[in-house]
């Protein structure tokens, strides 16, 4: 699977309009696009939102680059600055709850972005130290991670903020260990908030992995 994550900073006072644009324009325009697996958008702050598109492959995403650029041009009315865009093939992840196509399921998303010194060591840390915490957690829906050059982007979606916070305490303990913190060049940035719009175009089954 191929992921594209878009993180704009919004002009003050435009957040509600931007969210409506995503729900009423972006989602309908891309629904039914060949190779598109899911669209997810969440609110991450007073003037920030985040959107993630999941594709079968980089090729299927690239085939829609013109439509993507047209959409970004239309959305520019809401942007205070050019958005950050991260993309890459999945290197980690798992489905923890089966979710049916077009199922409406509330979610709370946590996405962490950081520049890593050693990609292999960072991926091993996800598998060896983070995944066991995921496996023991309650309310977890799905996890994933990509690399965009030397930047690691990892995420998890939960049933509720409470479920996420419970697991986040354990995840932060792992991150605070010196050896784990040394994996990053600087402190990672976390974007956290409720999912306000989502569309799933295939069935996801518990235990499946995007890798």
Predicted segments, located by residue:
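Short S/T/G/P-rich N-terminal loop/turn motif that feeds into the first structured element of a domain
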Residues: 1-50, 56-211
